[in-house]
Regions:
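Extended soluble regions of mature proteins
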Residues: 14-226
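Bacterial Sec-dependent N-terminal signal peptides
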Residues: 1-19
């Protein structure tokens, strides 16, 4: 698919932008290592069919990321899987929905920028040369950003790189930018309200405890209903 790009460096930070990201489920080593071949194939097929579309909006320091209207509950829930995210970079505030298995939490906290490590590695994504960057919190994340599009935004609330994130890889999903549209008018933003309210620190502790109790790393699938 092509990416619509028509944003100048001079005006990029004040543009009204709508981006569409596709997300595909990562087939983890744990899944590939399932001994029962029949069960392994069922799980892999379920993951391969788990394709999502997300919408990212950005305007005047406000940002949102949410799943599209084709949202379907496929029975798969992961630790740290995100729902809707809203960030006000002017007020340094964040409202983010995240799951721990099938329980929804609403993180309300001050926005803290990610600490990125930018590498010299490059690759081309949808015709754009991108640079690799990494960051880590409770889970490792790899971003491929494009300086030709100087918007410091990306999927899942990962912001702060000197170019839009064309691809974001987490242990659970890989997100790829498919379309970017320059909007004439500023979009409206929906602030998420559902979920048990916690701070980022409180969520990190709950997430770490759940990961430890399962005896596996973050990002692996916890519940599979068939």
């Amino acid at each position: 698919m092509s990416v619509t790009v028509g944003i100048s460096a001079a005006s990029a930070q004040t543009q009204n932008v709508k981006c569409t990201y596709s997300a595909t489920h990562v087939i983890s080593d744990a899944v590939k290592g399932i001994e029962d071949a029949h069960i392994r194939e069922i799980v892999i097929q379920k993951f391969q069919n788990d394709k999502k579309t997300f919408t990212m909006l950005y305007a005047d320091g406000k940002y949102s990321f949410s799943e599209g209207s084709n949202k379907v509950d496929n029975g798969i829930k992961s630790i740290g899987l995100a729902g809707d995210i809203y960030i006000d970079m002017v007020k340094d505030s964040v409202f983010a929905q995240k799951y721990i298995v099938d329980k929804l939490f609403l993180i309300k906290d001050k926005y803290v920028p990610y600490d990125w490590t930018v590498t010299k590695e490059e690759k081309t994504i949808n015709g754009k040369v991108c640079i690799k960057a990494t960051t880590s919190g409770n889970i490792p994340v790899t971003a491929w950003f494009c300086t030709d599009i100087p918007l410091n935004v990306g999927p899942l609330g990962y912001l702060g790189l000197p170019g839009i994130i064309m691809q974001l890889d987490t242990p659970t999903y890989s997100y790829v930018l498919q379309e970017m549209v320059d909007l004439k008018d500023a979009p409206s933003f929906d602030v998420p309200t559902k979920g048990k309210v916690v701070t980022q620190e409180e969520f990190n502790k709950l997430e770490a405890e759940k990961i430890k109790s399962r005896g596996t790393e973050a990002g692996k699938v916890r519940i599979i209903r068939m």
